[in-house]
Swiss-Prot record:
It comes from Trichormus variabilis (strain ATCC 29413 / PCC 7937) (Anabaena variabilis). This is UPF0060 membrane protein Ava_B0196. Coiled coil: none annotated. The lineage of its organism: Bacteria, Bacillati, Cyanobacteriota, Cyanophyceae, Nostocales. Pfam families: UPF0060. Belongs to the UPF0060 family. The chain crosses the membrane at residues 4-24, 31-51, 61-81, 86-106. PANTHER family: UPF0060 MEMBRANE PROTEIN YNFA (PTHR36116:SF1). It comes from the Bacteria. It is found in: Cell inner membrane. GO terms for cellular component: plasma membrane.
Length: 107
């Protein structure tokens, strides 16, 4: 359960942090948008270090599925775009990979 909490914190930090750069560079908003974005990216990196695992690459691989799910939720809630069946199928496939990695290495 603790792993999932840190993955969700990391996902929110990463998505929000990267989105602030999108807002600045793609939507033409103020560069000041990146100030909270950089802080969010620091939270993202810190959260992944709190996952109980000895290999960074394995943590990142398992986190990938949670990140993808969180990105699709962000697409829907923050950007107002409803995910289609292909988005949901992709998320499902990725989460299956996350489960395989988590249950085979984090027991």
């Amino acid at each position: 359960m603790q792993t999932l909490v840190f993955f969700l914190i990391a996902a929110l930090g990463e998505i929000f942090g990267c989105y602030t750069f999108w807002v600045w560079l793609r939507l033409g908003k103020s560069i000041l948008w990146i100030v909270p974005g950089v802080l969010a990216l620091i939270v993202f990196a810190f959260a992944l270090t709190k996952v109980n695992a000895s290999n960074a690459g394995r943590v990142y691989a398992a986190y990938g599925g949670v990140y993808i799910l969180s990105s699709v939720v962000w697409l829907w809630l923050a950007e107002g775009v409803k995910p289609d069946k292909w988005d949901l199928l992709g998320v499902t496939i990725c989460l299956l990979g996350t489960v395989v990695i988590l249950f085979s290495h984090y027991r």
